Amino acid sequence: KSEKIKNIWGNTINVDVASELLRSEVQEHIMMLKQAFNFQYIRFWNVFSPEFLIDMDNQNGNYNFTRLDLVFDFLVNQGLKPHMDLGMKPHMILYNLQSIRVCDEREKSYLQVEFMDLKKMEHFLDALMQHLIYRYGRREVDTWRMEFWFNEGLWSRQAFAEYFEQFGMIYQTVKKYSEG
């Protein structure tokens, strides 16, 4: 007996880095595409990039989420849901099918510096989750998707160990605030 497969791949579009969602022309295109294709999730990454002006060294928990809120406010107001990658992906350039992908050197520096300390990362993520629950409500945030990117270019035991340590911390922190 065959069953109809649920079309889960047709309800999400990739936007690129989160800061693109601050641009009005990108927002207009998303609204137009939503009307045409009726998707539910917007997938983006680099929510901790410098464009959001969040001081990652602020350990008193008073992070400035104002610019990040603009992204979430837009999505929620349009009836869309975030699908956030909590990792920091470099912009990659693919010249042709045979070439190697290259990342932007400017981004490479903040990719490696921002969350070298797991406690610092946990403190920030804890504050972010508290903020999201307070601003948007647990019921809403429970419907959001979150993932954590692994850089495929780092195939080593140390890279895997660090990734899974970070992933475990992210999973525990997110689950503390959200059942989704």
Model-derived regions: residue spans:
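Substrate-binding cleft and catalytic face of glycoside hydrolase catalytic domains
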Residues: 37-180
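Mature N-terminal, pre-catalytic/accessory segment of carbohydrate-active enzymes
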Residues: 1-40, 44-47, 58
